[in-house]
């Protein structure tokens, strides 16, 4: 199974490569151990999955045909075409770690950013419910049920606004 790490563009290494660069603007890609991507791509097996991952091991592309890839700035690994590997996608939620395709492990900073995004989304959703209910109350058009609903959504909104994104504990959303 092929595994080409940290593929970067570099200078041609032979006269033939130099001529191709000069005549056709070919960009040469080299793995960290000096392997030529264009030669190595021929060695990938047709019955495997090819995974491209970044410097943080996050999967950024998946294909069965290595010749379709432009791996500059990434690493490429070949893995067996088995169910567990086929579950992965390039959504950013998967990684290649310790020789295996696994669900992504988020850093504490990433988890906090996700919590901040979720907090903003929940507050926005609450405001969308609260606004028409407030209007109904202000115009003396609200039913008792709408007044009670407004109060529960306002309480929820306050509780969400107090959530610490570093250690989120989300309140239950009203019905």
Curated annotation (Swiss-Prot):
GO terms for biological process: virus tail fiber assembly. It comes from the Viruses. Coiled coil: none annotated. InterPro entries: Phage_T4_Gp38_tail_assem, TFA_Chaperone. Keywords: Chaperone, Viral release from host cell, Viral tail assembly, Viral tail fiber assembly. Acts catalytically in the formation of tail protein dimers. This is Probable tail fiber assembly protein. The gene is G.
């Amino acid at each position: 199974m092929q595994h080409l790490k940290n593929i970067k563009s570099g200078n041609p290494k032979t006269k033939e490569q130099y001529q191709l660069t000069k005549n056709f603007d070919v960009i040469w890609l080299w793995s960290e151990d000096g392997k030529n991507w264009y030669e190595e791509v021929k060695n990938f097996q047709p019955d495997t999955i090819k995974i491209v991952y970044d410097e943080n091991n996050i999967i950024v592309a998946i294909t069965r045909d290595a010749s379709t890839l432009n791996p500059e700035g990434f690493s490429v690994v070949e893995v067996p075409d088995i169910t567990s590997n086929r579950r992965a996608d390039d959504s950013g939620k998967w990684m290649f770690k310790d020789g295996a395709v696994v669900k992504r492990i988020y850093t504490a900073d990433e988890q906090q950013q996700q919590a901040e995004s979720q907090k903003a989304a929940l507050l926005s959703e609450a405001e969308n419910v609260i606004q028409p209910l407030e209007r109904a109350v202000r115009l003396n058009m609200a039913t008792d049920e709408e007044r009670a609903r407004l109060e529960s959504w306002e309480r929820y909104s306050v509780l969400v606004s107090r959530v610490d994104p570093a250690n989120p504990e989300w309140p239950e959303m009203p019905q």
